[in-house]
C-alpha cells in the first residue's frame, strides 16, 4: 500500500507547543543563529503522462479543482515550482523528442509541436493559478537517440550504454537551449536547468543519459554555458 490515493487528502492538523525535555521523540530544536541552505520551493512535474490524463479525463471544473488543490496557497498545498522534462521521461505516453532525425548541430528540423498538444496547455493552467509565484526548471532525461552512442533514447539498448557521443555535445547544448527559448517565447522563463536526470542510472526501460561527473563538467563548462551566453 503506497498511500498514493491519499496524496491530496487533508490530514489532522499538527499542533506545535513548547518543548518537553522528558519527551524527545517529537522534539524539534531550531537554532535561529545558524542559517543553512535556502529552500527555493517545493513542487512537481507536469509530465506527458500527467498532462494526458489531465487533458483527456477531466472536465473543466475538475481541471480547475485539481490546479487549485496543487498550486493555490490557501485552498491547496501551494506548490511553487515545476520541474519540466525536456522531451520524454519515464512518465510519458510514448518516447518522443524534438529533433527525431539526425541533422546538423544547429537542429534546423527542430519540431516542438508535441509539447504544445497537452503539456504546454497544462503548464499554462498551473501558472495561471497564481501568476508570477510559480517558478519553472527544466531537466532532460535523454537527448534524441542519434546524439547517443547506443542510438536510442533509452539508457541501455542492446547491452550498450546510451552515453552522449563525443561529437554531439554542441548539438545537445543547442537542444536544451532551444527548449528554453520555446518556453520563453510563450512567456515562461526557465529558472534553472539540469543537463540530465539520474546520471548514474542507465535504464533499459526508459529514457536516460548516463554521464560521469567529468562528462557533465565538460558539457556545462565548454558547451552549455557558452551556448546560453550566446543566446
Please annotate each region the language model reported.
Residues 8-190, 211-214, 222:
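N-terminal catalytic cores of secreted or lumenal carbohydrate-active enzymes
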Residues 3-4:
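Acidic, contiguous N-terminal accessory segments
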Residues 139-140, 192-198, 231:
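Core alpha/beta catalytic barrel or barrel-like domain that forms the active/cofactor pocket
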Amino acid at each position: 500500500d503506497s498511500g498514493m490515493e491519499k496524496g491530496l487528502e487533508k490530514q489532522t492538523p499538527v499542533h506545535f507547543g513548547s518543548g518537553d525535555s522528558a519527551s524527545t521523540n517529537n522534539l524539534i530544536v531550531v537554532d535561529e543563529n545558524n542559517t543553512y541552505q535556502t529552500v527555493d520551493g517545493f513542487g512537481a512535474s507536469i509530465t506527458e503522462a500527467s498532462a494526458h490524463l489531465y487533458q483527456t479525463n477531466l472536465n473543466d471544473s475538475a481541471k480547475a479543482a485539481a490546479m487549485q488543490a496543487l498550486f493555490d496557497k490557501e485552498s491547496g498545498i501551494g506548490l511553487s515550482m515545476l520541474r519540466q522534462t525536456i522531451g520524454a521521461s519515464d512518465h510519458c505516453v510514448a518516447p518522443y523528442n524534438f529533433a527525431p532525425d539526425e541533422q546538423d548541430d544547429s537542429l534546423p528540423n527542430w519540431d516542438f509541436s508535441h509539447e504544445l498538444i497537452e503539456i504546454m496547455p497544462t503548464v499554462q493552467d498551473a501558472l495561471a493559478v497564481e501568476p508570477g509565484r510559480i517558478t519553472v526548471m527544466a531537466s532532460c532525461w535523454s537527448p534524441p537517440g542519434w546524439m547517443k552512442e547506443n542510438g536510442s533514447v533509452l539508457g541501455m539498448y542492446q547491452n550498450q550504454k546510451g552515453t552522449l557521443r563525443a561529437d554531439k555535445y554542441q548539438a545537445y547544448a543547442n537542444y536544451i537551449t532551444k527548449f528554453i527559448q520555446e518556453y520563453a517565447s510563450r512567456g515562461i522563463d526557465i529558472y534553472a536547468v539540469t543537463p540530465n536526470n539520474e546520471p548514474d542510472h542507465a535504464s533499459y526501460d526508459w529514457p536516460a543519459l548516463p554521464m560521469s561527473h567529468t562528462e557533465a563538467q565538460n558539457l556545462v563548462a565548454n558547451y552549455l554555458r557558452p551556448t546560453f551566453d550566446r543566446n
